[in-house]
Design a protein with these regions (language model features):
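N-terminal hydrophobic/helix-forming segments and targeting peptides
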Residues: 1-332
């Protein structure tokens, strides 16, 4: 089930550049359902499922990485100085429980400031070490920590967790592969790396695959909490078909095909116009001489925080859209 798959992938450690554990979990989940599965030099997990003869090759991309902090220095007192990996804000990190890949736990703290505005340079991580020597037995320079995993049900349909960006899309793509029979078109499913630091993995994968068209699957921002009204996207009202963001204007034929798939599936959808951000869809679109591409988004509150919130009804609808889309007629 989609919810079970989501819970499985949410709990795996995988900051940008260290996505191997996520890829291993997905490989174990998918290997019996696909025609080929491999990992490329970048670390992207590339899964292929053949369609009917003369079908187009559609690249779907959902990124495995999530934001974190990397250790840059260790003070004599044992506190860790850190710098962001991806879009980490100071407000989201204040007194947050974090965990390293080794299992070491810590608390991210902002030190008091005197006469200056607090910034990321004032952030440190307390791992309980009495001094630098003890800290070095626990972590080292270059180690990365992420928000500690916790899955919190909110009401009947909603779930909060860190790494929802973009593990919810990884769960969607995995379920598409497991549930679809022989699709009309060939599926090249990429579980990409390093999206949070510049869609690096998807760019390399798209160049190698050279798809006929592509779809990024990601979260998008929300407009349904106090004093937050844009983008005009609400949780529970359907997955969002992206028209544009800072990185791309969706190719009209792909955008319209996603809308048609939603209407054929009989599920609600929203139109997304995001005045910031970017997704793997742009990396596909910019590849080689250009690839027709779009993005299907899951509305998500409090993106890049320890409590990213989605609505499972949007997830269920998105899965139906993807099923219809992959069986679409995209010409000879």
């Amino acid at each position: 089930m989609l919810l079970d798959t989501l819970k499985t992938v949410l709990c795996v450690y995988g900051p940008s550049g260290q996505e191997t554990r996520v890829a291993d979990v997905l490989t174990a989940m998918l290997r019996e359902h696909v025609d080929s599965i491999r990992t490329d030099v970048m670390g992207n997990l590339i899964v292929e499922k053949k369609g009917r003869e003369n079908g187009k090759t559609i690249m779907f991309s959902a990124h495995m990485d999530h934001i974190g902090l990397v250790v840059t220095d260790i003070e004599d007192e044992g506190y860790l100085r850190v710098t962001p990996v991806g879009g980490v804000s100071l407000d989201s990190m204040r007194c947050r429980h974090v965990v390293f890949g080794s299992g070491v736990h810590g608390v991210a703290v902002c030190q008091p400031t005197k006469g200056e505005t607090a910034g990321m340079q004032h952030l440190f991580v307390d791992i309980g070490a009495k001094d630098k020597a003890e800290a070095l037995t626990m972590v080292n320079l270059g180690d990365a920590c992420v928000f500690a995993p916790e899955i919190i049900p909110l009401g009947e349909h909603r779930i909060a967790a860190p790494a929802m960006d973009d593990r919810c899309a990884c769960a969607l793509l995995a379920e598409l592969i497991m549930q679809i029979g022989t699709p009309r078109n060939n599926i090249a499913a990429v579980f990409s790396v390093q999206e949070e630091v510049g869609t690096r993995g998807a760019a390399a994968a798209a160049f190698r695959i050279a798809p006929d068209l592509g779809v990024g699957i990601d979260v998008t921002a929300w407009g349904d909490t106090p004093e937050v009204k844009l983008p005009a996207v609400k949780l529970g009202e359907g997955a969002a078909v992206k028209f544009m963001d800072r990185s791309m204007i969706a190719t009209p034929c792909v955008r319209d095909a996603l809308i048609a798939a939603a209407e054929k599936a009989g599920v609600p959808y929203q139109r997304e116009i995001l005045p910031f951000g970017g997704t793997d869809g742009a990396a596909i679109q910019h590849s080689r001489g250009g690839v027709p591409a779009g993005t299907l988004s899951i509305p998500c509150r409090y993106v890049h925080s320890a409590c990213e919130v989605i609505d499972m009804r949007d997830m269920d609808g998105a899965l139906e859209i993807l099923k219809e889309f992959v069986n679409g007629d995209f010409g000879a």
